[in-house]
Amino acid sequence: MLPKLKISAFLLKRLERTKQQCSGCLFGVFYGEGTLLLLSFNIESSLGQLNYEQIQHRFPAELDLCGLVKFGGCTDGEAHLNEVIKSVDITDNPILLQCELGTLVGLRASFFVHGKLEEVPYEVMEAHQLYNDFCFTRLQCGFFLQTAATPESVAREMHVLRKRVADGNLVFNVPQTKIFINNYGPLDKQFSGDSQIQDLIDVIPTPGHEKETASVDKKKLKGQNTPVKRLAPTGCDYEVIPIDVMRSRSRDPVSGEPPHPALSIAVTNEEQIRVQVPLEIEAMAILCRKTKLQRLYDVLIESICRGLRLFELSLIEHLTESGSGKLLVPASYHFYPQEFGHFVSCAYLEGLSDDTPSMLMRRKRLHRQFALPISRPYFRRANQMLFLGETEDAPWTPLLNTHIGLRPSGVVDGKEYLVNGNYHYYHYLQQQVQDKGWGCAYRSLQTICSWFVLQGYTNAPIPTHLEVQEYLHKINDKPAAFVGSSQWIGSTEISMCLQGFLNVDSKILHVASGAELATIASELAMHFQTQGTPVMIGGGVLAHTIIGVDYCVQTGQVKFLILDPHYTGADDLATIQIKGWCGWKGMDFWAKGSYYNLCMPQRPILY
């Protein structure tokens, strides 16, 4: 019986944007009673060795090679076909997608059945259904690798280490609970052989919920206010289950002794001098919530092995390319490109900055393999996923993406053009700064800077009011008395600061009166389509941040999505949305008799 085929809406949009004749590999998740969900693809080079195996190691465990995609009249796919088919493990029926260039019209999906193609229908899985049906695990563990500083030795010792990992001696634990999972399954009596991943999720409180489950070690938590929490990844709606790793003293599933940390596993070979390299692994897996909990152990082992393969690749590449004979320490980074709808992992070496030639080359190669533009950062360190709820002592951060969940603007036949990516909402009185009445433009600047940080363009800290004033004095825009004062700034000063702090250029747009703001609706729409950055608007009145427009070309009706920095209350999303501090505003919001200047930051070309 052929698998039931579903395709992620994220993947379909990526396929539609591909406008070059080429072929690539498809990656998907096989789950339930014979359903194949296609989630991702890569572009294969027409020359040299295929790269799908290395790409698969970057994906969460369970996201596996399952077929081939051909774009246009590409003939490269014929050469790749046999090799790819032989490498597909998750199904006996590899899949072939045939796409026209730049369109989904005519998209055909076929399974290989006894060497012949059989065309099949498919269902589209939208984002909300993905978030409802699937979750991720994020596992953290450490090992020591003892190896000579040669590619051959690293490959050999990594192979041995992976075998040790898979020997059945590891035990997994949900942090701060007594939920342990070994190679026989979960050790907690509340779970049975029929238990599913969702049953595990149900006993883990969400971030911010101060409750303990029956499985929480109450002695350990006595006197603490740190209940176990699911992790909330920034900018997406997947739930992420945290996992720790331990070693079992016994393979006996009923052993009464608790496991102990796995951080001392080492691989040694006394015939050669060895360098000890610490390996701090962070590994991910994707799971259908209805997956049997009994399968979790094997999935987590595979996620560790994928992380180790990424480390191996990064170490060997560096040794081969640099010729230095020096081993650097690798680290795991997880990325969530908004276009993908799933995580991608990379291993970067400490001591190599993002701007070293080898790092630039690797990222450029990744962009090409994933059909991503070489003009925006996706895999710089600053792009790495942040997991909320990970630590109790995490530094304060403002609310993220406060416009999500707002009701529609009400513009008839309008089209929304919104900020592209993540931002933080900065407003009056945050960080104990008494800036009510004068700090609105400073707060708008901070919101804009947060966008560039969260999109991976920079690691620079968000500038404070004082730092802004000191910089404007430094470039002779303001007198010395301005530093430490309560004087406001405008759009021009914002553009100067963006250039000075972030090396970001801005476009300044002048509007003679609030009544004329409707005339620039199309220009704002184009800005959000091409640049996607928040826009600061000031002039003769108070400053605000525009993060979107809803515009009907036929009627000219427009509403502006405003982030208001004048809010002075607590960071409560419901209050901010209900009271309109983040919301859609019509033309009556603007002062008809006042002029306005808009600072429209431009994305730098960076990857």
UniProtKB/Swiss-Prot annotation:
BP-aspect Gene Ontology terms: proteolysis
Catalytic residues (UniProt): C440, D564, H566
Molecular-function GO terms, alphabetical: deUFMylase activity
Pfam family, one: UfSP2_N
Protease keyword on record: yes
Top-level taxonomy: Eukaryota, Metazoa, Ecdysozoa, Arthropoda, Hexapoda
Family as reported in the entry's similarity comment: Belongs to the peptidase C78 family.
Keywords, in A-Z order: Hydrolase, Protease, Thiol protease, Ubl conjugation pathway
Species the sequence originates in: Drosophila melanogaster
Name of this protein: Probable Ufm1-specific protease 2
UniProt xrefs under Gene3D superfamilies: 3.90.70.130
Broadest EC class assigned to this enzyme: hydrolase
InterPro entries hit by this protein: Papain-like_cys_pep_sf, UfSP1/2_DUB_cat, UfSP2-like_N
Gene Ontology cellular-component annotations: endomembrane system; endoplasmic reticulum; nucleus
EC annotation from Swiss-Prot or TrEMBL: 3.4.22.-
